[in-house]
């Protein structure tokens, strides 16, 4: 029994190291590669998915990161685990919507991007158990209770910096790029529709 308790107490540091040096890069790295694939195939063009698909990508990023933020801010209990699992399930549903949008668009989705999507789809389902291990012990309360973070301030800075640099900024850039292109396309369509009217007016004046 004593050896078992010692093994359980040693699990938490191992889970922390696995989260920081394996799980976090495994989530942010493919996410950044996915953004690069979108940029390379000009997702900002309306026919290539445009703003709608970019918003779906932002939603997926938030759904994947929500379990991490919840586990860092609140005590681990059945209610929190339910919320984290719900976020993971929501991520899967949004991923299915992303696939439907990609199939309808004209953008070429390479085999590399497809493999990246497959990897990202399963990420929340093994991140959630990892965060449960990282934030032991699990209480029996069914409420959200703030707790001291299981990670140090330095760890939190690494997580926040990584999420910002490899997640928030790239996908914000993608969304802004899509919105700008949508405005350009809208302005161009207005000008195109106005041109025939101007031509017909000139013809009547000439007559």
Predicted features by range, described:
Residues 78-148:
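Membrane-proximal helix-loop-helix units in multi-pass membrane proteins
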Residues 32-52, 182:
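Membrane-interface helix-loop junction between the first two transmembrane segments
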Residues 2-21, 66-82, 130-157:
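Helix-coil boundary and interhelical linker segments in multi-pass alpha-helical membrane proteins
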Residues 37-40, 63-76, 94-105:
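Membrane-helix exit/interface motif
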Residues 151-207:
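A hydrophobic membrane-anchoring alpha-helix module
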Residues 57-71, 119-129:
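Core segments of transmembrane alpha-helices
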Residues 28-37, 88-102, 162-178:
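Transmembrane alpha-helical segments that form the membrane-embedded catalytic/substrate-channel core
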Residues 45-58, 109-116:
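Juxtamembrane helix-capping/reentrant segments at transmembrane boundaries
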């Amino acid at each position: 029994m004593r050896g078992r308790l010692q093994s359980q107490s040693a699990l938490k540091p191992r889970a922390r190291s696995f989260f920081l040096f394996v799980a976090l890069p495994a989530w942010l790295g493919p996410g950044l590669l996915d953004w690069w694939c979108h940029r390379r195939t000009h997702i900002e063009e309306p026919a290539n998915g445009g703003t709608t698909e970019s918003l779906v990508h932002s939603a997926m990023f938030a759904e994947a990161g929500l379990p991490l933020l919840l586990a860092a801010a609140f005590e681990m209990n059945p209610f929190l685990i339910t919320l984290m699992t719900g976020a993971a399930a929501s991520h899967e549903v949004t991923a299915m919507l992303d696939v439907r949008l990609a199939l309808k668009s004209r953008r070429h989705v390479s085999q590399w991007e497809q493999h990246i999507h497959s990897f990202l789809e399963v990420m929340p389902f093994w991140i959630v158990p990892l965060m449960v291990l990282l934030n032991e012990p699990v209480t029996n309360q069914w409420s959200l209770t703030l707790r001291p973070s299981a990670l140090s301030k330095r760890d939190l800075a690494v997580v926040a910096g990584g999420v910002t640099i490899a997640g928030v900024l790239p996908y914000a850039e993608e969304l802004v790029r899509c919105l700008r292109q949508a405005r350009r396309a809208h302005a161009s369509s207005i000008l195109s529709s106005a041109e025939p009217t101007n031509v017909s007016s000139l013809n009547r004046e000439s007559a």
